[in-house]
Amino acid sequence: MSQSICSTGLRWLWLVVVVLIIDLGSKYLILQNFALGDTVPLFPSLNLHYARNYGAAFSFLADSGGWQRWFFAGIAIGISVLLAVMMYRSKATQKLNNIAYALIIGGALGNLFDRLWHGFVVDMIDFYVGDWHFATFNLADTAICVGAALIVLEGFLPSKAKKQ
């Protein structure tokens, strides 16, 4: 028996599009208005800083000769497909999980676009305290982390709340 897309978690795919538009739009603005390494202070402890990441989180494997571009692209595609299948198999009313999956897919696809189009991921958010700087990241990374945090949060909810 087939089910309506609107009755499945795929109903939340609109959030993937929103994440992609915001992420790719922010990266476009950085690429059009910043030279590599440019920094603009926004608030105390927060800068816009144009950086290129040829690896993964914290520049993992950034200096590995180029193969990592395709490796991380494959991971992004695989995770996106897996989460889309999970959304299809879940009910649209399971909001927390589906929102989490959509955020992760949107972030993964945003960074995938960068890897395939530019050969690197555009990063621009520089959080710091004093002289200590956290790794520069982007809005796709933020969406992925928020999605992962929602999945962890869902694990702590009582069973009754999960069945909604």
Swiss-Prot record:
InterPro entries in UniProt: Peptidase_A8
Pathway: Protein modification; lipoprotein biosynthesis (signal peptide cleavage)
EC number: 3.4.23.36
Active site per the UniProt annotation: D123, D141
Cited PROSITE patterns: SPASE_II
Protein location: Cell inner membrane
Reactions the enzyme catalyzes: Release of signal peptides from bacterial membrane prolipoproteins. Hydrolyzes -Xaa-Yaa-Zaa-|-(S,diacylglyceryl)Cys-, in which Xaa is hydrophobic (preferably Leu), and Yaa (Ala or Ser) and Zaa (Gly or Ala) have small, neutral side chains
Family: Belongs to the peptidase A8 family.
Name this polypeptide is given: Lipoprotein signal peptidase
Record lineage: Bacteria, Pseudomonadati, Pseudomonadota, Gammaproteobacteria, Enterobacterales
Name of the gene encoding the protein in the UniProt record: lspA
